[in-house]
């Protein structure tokens, strides 16, 4: 009897036994077609055996056409992911094979890679960066001020790998970034890279997967999930904007795509480039401990000056009611527009206002299913929860005390800033970019095209606009609320605020004219602003690392979170307490249980347990043993978050 254990791309499934027919020759990693629950699926040959304990064994139907297979390197990555992030093999296989490629054959278009490329001349600083990268196999961080030409450096590195016939993966935190990168790529290399994201159709994904497996696809640009594409000849992984939180997946499998990419590079013997003007503290730590190497660019491309940073003390501003732009900022915008230059107004808050409340009884409009305020969206005339998507109408009277004309809104969102800008600058062409206003890559591309062609005078945006866009005529950036996010209790609040302000400021003055950035703040003495103002990220990183070390928090320790959720708060809390009580004794620190910052989400109450351990401690082994000591009832969902980025 010949048995193959087949790994199917089905959540929470382990490899299943199937019988191999006499005429079928199989190797580990081969892709096969099998019957599973009244359907035919593509599976991976995970293991070969001569016997099975299963009572009924189905027979493998066939091998996938063209003898396609998953490399041993990708299989090793699946095993590592399952072990490190404590997730089921089937769930991870679903990332590698997100669709069934065993259906009728599809013609695969081969990328026509030229043997020459039109690449611009690098500066001496950039040439030195390429040389340093080539001389070591360590992951290399290209750290440079915004506009220093980091993309051009990794384009030159990509060219070297394409000349060797290798496959290349370019990872972006948001696929919204891809249009400008794609256009620049086509200009340099003469062919269009493959895009891998959630908007790609099933038919396209099937074609792309087959193209990758057959080595006909050479370059892919994608977000998190592109990391798991089954390359056979992967030579280079570029992780652009490596600091970005979007690389961490916070649903289904909880994993960090940046960190996993480093591991994939080890398995595939692929070289790694990380790029950022504001690297993560983890990456800075890895450089200081000599795990990564550093390339620093101190000059903008063509030696363009960095923008001036001006901090506006909002405690000294006397703003009219429902106004959020200071006189200093308004005057600066007027001058900028008179000079035919573009303006970016940044506020990392969607909608019109973050809170509606009753002045009579104090009632706050919160989500029925979450512990979150409902955000007013004037454009759609709705109150919306940005966590679960619940919407309701805008009330004319208070539903609690029934009083009329007592409802008021607090604080601005970008829709409110748009309204104010339209009143102040009625002749200007104003556009808004956020997840609400640009829901598709095509819409984002349209807005970017309008900005590049000077069809927009004032662009108002959320965090989406901070991610690497290049607008040569944009010379003024106004940050409406520079305090937003810096005063909460999150471990990484200071780091995120510094990165965000530095990144958004970097959109200004990328052409021939010097830029200026205005930060509006009610706490102008915040030390973060002083680092941003002088561009001293090294001192910021040093100070932040000292704070983390004193608190024994990452990157100086390991952390994991257990998130328990369910519809009965008392039952979930009881289970959480029981879990903590039976924790095996070890050299770990256990905090909690405590309500999660988002204590209710989509109708479920949430409690969190945080575990802190030494970097050499086997946290996964400890958690596996710990959780085996208790049976979790079906009404309680438990998630394990290894290396949590947030504690919401």
From Swiss-Prot:
Belongs to the helicase family. PriA subfamily. Binds 2 zinc ions per subunit. The gene is priA. Its cofactor is Zn(2+). This is Replication restart protein PriA. GO terms for molecular function: 3'-5' DNA helicase activity; ATP binding; ATP hydrolysis activity; DNA binding; zinc ion binding. It catalyses: Couples ATP hydrolysis with the unwinding of duplex DNA by translocating in the 3'-5' direction; ATP + H2O = ADP + phosphate + H(+). SUPFAM superfamilies: P-loop containing nucleoside triphosphate hydrolases. GO terms for biological process: DNA recombination; DNA replication initiation; DNA replication, synthesis of primer; double-strand break repair.
């Amino acid at each position: 009897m010949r048995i193959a254990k087949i790994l199917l791309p089905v959540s929470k499934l382990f490899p299943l036994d199937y019988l191999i027919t006499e005429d079928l020759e199989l190797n580990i990693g081969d892709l096969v077609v099998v019957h599973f629950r009244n359907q035919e699926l593509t599976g991976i040959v995970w293991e070969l055996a001569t016997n099975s304990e299963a009572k009924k064994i189905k027979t493998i139907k066939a091998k996938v056409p063209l003898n396609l297979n998953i490399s041993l390197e990708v299989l090793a990555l699946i095993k590592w992911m399952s072990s490190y992030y404590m997730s089921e093999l089937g769930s991870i296989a679903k990332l590698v094979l997100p669709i069934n490629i065993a259906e009728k054959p599809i013609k695969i278009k081969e990328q026509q890679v030229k043997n020459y490329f039109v690449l611009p001349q690098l500066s001496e600083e950039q040439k030195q960066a390429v040389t340093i990268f080539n001389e070591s196999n360590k992951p290399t961080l290209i750290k440079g001020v915004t506009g220093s030409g980091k993309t051009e450096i990794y384009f030159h590195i990509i060219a070297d790998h394409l000349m060797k016939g290798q496959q290349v993966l370019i990872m972006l935190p948001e696929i919204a970034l891809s249009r400008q990168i794609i256009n620049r790529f086509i200009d340099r290399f003469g062919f269009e890279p493959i895009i891998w994201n959630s908007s790609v159709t099933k038919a396209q994904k099937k074609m792309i997967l087959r193209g990758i497996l057959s080595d006909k696809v050479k370059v892919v640009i994608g977000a998190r999930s592109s990391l798991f594409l089954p390359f056979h000849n992967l030579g280079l992984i570029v992780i652009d904007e490596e600091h970005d939180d979007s690389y961490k997946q916070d649903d289904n499998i909880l994993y960090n795509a940046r960190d996993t990419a480093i591991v994939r590079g080890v398995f595939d013997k692929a070289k790694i480039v990380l790029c950022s003007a504001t690297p993560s503290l983890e990456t800075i730590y890895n450089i200081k401990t000599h795990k990564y190497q550093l390339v620093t660019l101190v000059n903008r491309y063509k030696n363009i000056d960095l923008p001036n940073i001006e901090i506006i003390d909002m405690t000294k501003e006397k703003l009219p009611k429902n106004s959020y732009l200071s006189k200093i900022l308004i005057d600066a915008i007027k001058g900028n527009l008179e000079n035919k230059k573009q303006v970016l107004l940044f506020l990392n808050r969607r909608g019109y206002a973050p809170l509606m409340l009753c002045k009579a009884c104090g009632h706050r409009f919160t989500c029925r299913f979450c512990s979150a305020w409902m955000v007013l969206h004037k454009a759609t005339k709705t109150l919306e929860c940005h966590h679960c998507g619940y919407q309701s109408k805008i009330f004319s009277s208070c539903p609690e005390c029934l009083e009329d004309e007592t409802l008021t809104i607090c604080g601005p969102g970008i829709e409110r800033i748009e309204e104010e800008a339209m009143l102040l600058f009625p002749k200007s062409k104003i556009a808004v970019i956020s997840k609400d206003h640009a829901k598709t890559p095509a819409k984002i591309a349209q807005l970017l095209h309008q900005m590049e062609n000077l069809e927009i005078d004032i662009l108002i945006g959320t965090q989406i606009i901070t991610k690497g866009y290049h607008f040569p005529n944009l010379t003024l950036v106004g940050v409406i609320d520079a305090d937003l996010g810096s005063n909460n209790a999150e471990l990484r609040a200071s780091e995120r605020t510094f990165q965000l302000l530095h990144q958004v400021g970097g959109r200004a003055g990328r052409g021939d004219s010097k830029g200026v950035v205005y930060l509006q703040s009610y706490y102008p003495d915040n030390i973060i602003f002083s680092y941003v103002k002088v561009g001293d990220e090294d001192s910021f990183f040093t100070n932040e690392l000292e704070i983390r070390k004193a608190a024994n928090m990452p990157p100086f320790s390991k952390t994991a979170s257990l998130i328990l959720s369910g519809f009965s708060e008392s039952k979930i809390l009881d289970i959480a307490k029981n879990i903590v009580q039976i924790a095996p004794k070890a050299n770990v620190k256990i905090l909690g249980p405590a309500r999660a910052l988002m204590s209710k989400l989509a109708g479920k109450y949430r409690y969190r347990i945080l575990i802190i351990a030494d970097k050499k401690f086997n946290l996964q082994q400890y958690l596996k043993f710990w959780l085996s000591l208790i049976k979790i009832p079906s009404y309680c969902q438990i998630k394990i978050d290894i290396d949590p980025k947030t504690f919401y």
